């Protein structure tokens, strides 16, 4: 039976009911009357998975018969969220399944809410990877993700006394019905050990990696369903286990811990995402994780290639590997090692294959985010890879000096090895040198990569550098997250936008239609009322759905400037209670996002948000017109509730710091207006929607760079010379937001007035003025609705389908099959 026939057979309420009941009985071994909501979810998910299996096998067969070139996307993060609703939607079974469960006395929405988010990522990096996989499958392209099957993910965030607390995220505690275990395709991964020279008759150097220990990578596949079921690709996730035998003799002597020591050490590799690198053990574990991902993926890629090929002559014509940020940069050394050590290729041939196969996406302009590892750690953990990296660097150094003779300073800047008291391996440089393509993720970002981050490399290889502006999948972020708006759009312009987002342009002719505006506003209000219930359940704070929902949800980081948002809140609060000037319009300030466990300043900013909220929300003088809420444990499923309800999208990073951002695209797609700096993709959003339909403020990236270079920025002058700035900072320092912990936020005052690394005070006056404009225009419902509809109509450029097509044509050279 083909997948189409299988879906047709299932495309009936009774058929799906029977499948769910069968899995309740034969998979869960339960009577229907004993089923919990979680049980119903599991039975339903397995029934849906049955429908996917034929599609997975048929898709794989189609790709293999065509001997199509395939993309392998390596990423430490894949933030896929929940899968049941998404899979039903893409299969066209959502309404049928809803009715099937309703007839069984169960609400599908309640069932979907029991599914845990897959804890396989943290922020935009992982969500972008998930959007790309969705687009690849929808476009029918052979593209597969490779990642780590984290047992706990990053962490579950709880808020205690205003502070972030990290708890384990047991997302797989009850198993995942979407993971198809593949123990027969497990692979052996060598690690540690030492290098020996093996003599040979050819008098060449033949290094042998010996005395290594072993990790075993066990894969599980998560199906990725393309819209309409045209193709079902997969995300392959690896768990780490040890090959060490359980030592029964030690166990019998009573030392259980020692008996399982090796197993536990290996399994740590796939326990958590991003273990803290503030201590040596954490750094070693991170390096092991990155190597584990790369080595497992490489073995599987080679296994797939060898199904149709016996030599490596066509490897770059059949295989494209994309490194998503620097975490998989070891792919360069690992592919070289495999080609040279395991397949006896000469260096030059192996290098030609490697560079023709690999592409690298850079996601940052923060130098500290371009990973570096101590060479001493490399030598202990991956001695053969360090040898190969030294050889790559030696040959690269000769190339640099041939082009720029005697320019030792340039060579120092470009070298993979950072010399100093403690040698470091620069992973970003390794990725650039080993790839044929290096791309940024927004026009400004790509420009700054070549002019500011790695200008020497751009001068050497200008043809390698290109831009691929990020995108998001409209199927999850509009069709699934905002079904009422999706139906309104369908009635106006049809449903072709689901697979070609440019069709939303047709909404422009509806932007001033009174009836359309009324329905658009009604849908936004329903979404706000739903979010208000979520906020109350999560925080205990009741908010007014008629207020402006002013939203900033993203990873907590100083450059993203949640602090600037808080300074505006403090300004409005102090102005109201001290001067009696109330805000023009009621606002609910919504925050969400996680801070890295070791990032003290970011965690203190979370505390500040909650402390300000505690004061504002309990002050009867203002709490009818101001509320501040921090929703804990931000994740994809929560974003799907927040984004459709937002009126105002805060995209306020310091110009020149945000690579792209994708939240900005999701909010605009759902009819929120953006207040933001000219940074990342905000610039391109402004170009698309028109400057009259976005609220831009603040310094430009080039202005900030000039001030840095000339050291002309004096935040104290803003404090002393601007009464509004002074009033806000004095309130911050006065302990009125930390009465129980005096002096708690003094460091923020000192930081802002002292050096203000992220230019908060320079941008604050412009930000406050722009927020006043927002308040005035929100009070003009017709104008606001017009702008919001225009935003939705003009986001066609920001579909991940467009992004993936550009990668496919310009970098990967893959096609739909």
Give names to the regions the model predicted.
Residues 1-817:
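A conserved ligand/cofactor-binding region detector
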């Amino acid at each position: 039976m083909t997948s189409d026939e299988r879906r047709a057979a299932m495309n009936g309420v009774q058929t799906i009911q029977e499948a769910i009941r069968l899995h309740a009985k034969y998979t869960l071994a339960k009577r229907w009357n004993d089923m919990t909501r979680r049980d119903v979810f599991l039975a339903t998910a397995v029934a849906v998975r049955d429908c996917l299996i034929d599609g997975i096998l048929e898709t794989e067969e189609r790709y293999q018969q065509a001997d199509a070139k395939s993309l392998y996307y390596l990423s430490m993060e894949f933030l896929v969220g929940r899968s049941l609703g998404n899979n039903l939607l893409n299969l066209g079974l959502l309404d049928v399944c809803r009715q099937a469960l309703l007839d069984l006395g169960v609400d599908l929405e309640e069932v979907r809410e029991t599914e845990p988010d897959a804890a396989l990522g943290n922020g935009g990096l992982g969500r972008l990877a998930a959007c790309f996989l969705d687009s690849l499958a929808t476009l029918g392209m052979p593209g597969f993700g490779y990642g780590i099957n984290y047992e706990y993910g990053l962490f579950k965030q709880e808020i205690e006394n205003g502070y972030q607390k990290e708890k384990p995220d047991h997302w797989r505690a009850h198993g995942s019905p979407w993971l198809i275990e593949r123990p027969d395709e497990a692979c052996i991964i060598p690690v540690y050990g030492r290098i020996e020279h093996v003599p040979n008759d050819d008098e060449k150097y033949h290094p042998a990696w010996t005395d290594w220990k072993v990790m075993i990578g066990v894969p599980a596949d998560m199906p990725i369903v393309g819209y309409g079921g045209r193709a079902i690709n997969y995300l392959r996730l690896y768990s780490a286990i040890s090959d060490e035998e359980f030592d029964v003799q030690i166990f019998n002597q009573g030392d259980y811990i020692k008996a399982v020591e090796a197993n536990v050490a290996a399994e740590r590799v796939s326990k958590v995402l991003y273990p803290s690198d503030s201590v040596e053990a954490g750094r070693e574990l991170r390096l092991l994780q990155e190597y584990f991902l790369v080595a497992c993926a490489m073995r599987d890629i080679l296994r797939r290639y060898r199904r149709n090929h016996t030599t490596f002559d066509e490897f770059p014509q059949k295989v494209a590997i994309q490194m998503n940020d620097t975490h998989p940069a070891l792919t360069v050394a690992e592919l070289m090692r495999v080609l040279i050590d395991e397949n006896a290729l000469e260096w030059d041939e192996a290098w030609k294959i490697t560079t023709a196969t690999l592409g690298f996406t850079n996601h940052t302009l923060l130098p500290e985010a371009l990973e570096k590892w101590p060479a001493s750690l490399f030598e202990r953990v991956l001695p053969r890879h360090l040898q190969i990296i030294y050889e790559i660097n030696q040959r690269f150094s000769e190339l640099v000096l041939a082009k720029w003779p005697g320019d030792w300073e340039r060579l120092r800047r470009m070298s993979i090895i950072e010399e100093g008291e403690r040698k470091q391996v620069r992973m970003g440089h390794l990725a650039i040198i080993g790839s044929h393509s290096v791309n940024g993720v927004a026009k400004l970002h790509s420009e700054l990569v070549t002019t500011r981050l790695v200008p020497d490399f751009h001068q050497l290889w200008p043809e390698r550098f290109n831009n691929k502006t990020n995108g998001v999948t409209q199927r999850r972020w509009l069709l699934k997250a905002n079904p009422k708006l999706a139906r309104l759009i369908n009635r106006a312009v049809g449903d072709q936008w689901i697979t070609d987002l440019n069709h939303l342009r047709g909404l422009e002719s509806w932007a001033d239609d009174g009836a359309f505006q009324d329905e658009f506003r009604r849908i936004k209000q329903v979404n706000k009322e739903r979010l208000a219930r979520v906020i109350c359940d999560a925080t205990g704070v009741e908010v007014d759905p008629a207020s402006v929902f002013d939203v900033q949800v993203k990873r907590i980081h100083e450059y993203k400037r949640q602090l600037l948002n808080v300074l505006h809140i403090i300004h409005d609060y102090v102005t109201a209670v001290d001067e009696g000037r109330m805000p023009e319009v009621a606002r609910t300030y919504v925050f969400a996002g996680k801070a890295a466990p070791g990032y003290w300043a970011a965690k203190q900013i979370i505390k500040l948000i909650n402390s300000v909220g505690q004061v504002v929300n309990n002050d009867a003088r203002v709490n009818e017109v101001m509320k501040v809420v921090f929703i804990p444990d931000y994740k994809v499923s929560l974003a799907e509730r927040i984004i459709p309800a937002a009126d105002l999208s805060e995209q306020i990073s310091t110009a020149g710091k945000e690579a792209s951002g994708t939240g900005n695209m999701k909010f605009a797609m759902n009819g929120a207006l953006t207040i933001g700096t000219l940074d990342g993709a905000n610039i391109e959003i402004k170009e698309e929607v028109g400057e009259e339909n976005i609220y831009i403020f603040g310094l430009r990236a080039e202005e900030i760079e000039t001030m840095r270079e000339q050291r002309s920025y004096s935040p104290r002058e803003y404090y002393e010379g601007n009464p509004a700035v002074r009033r806000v900072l004095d309130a911050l320092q006065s302990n009125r937001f930390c009465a129980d912990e005096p002096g708690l936020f003094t460091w923020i005052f000192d930081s802002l007035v002292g050096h203000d690394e992220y230019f908060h005070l320079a941008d604050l006056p412009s930000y406050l003025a722009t927020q006043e404009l927002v308040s005035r225009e929100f009070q003009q419902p017709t104008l606001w609705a017009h702008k919001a509809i225009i935003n939705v109509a003009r986001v066609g450029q920001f579909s991940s389908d467009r992004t993936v097509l550009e990668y496919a044509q310009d970098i990967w050279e893959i096609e739909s099959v």
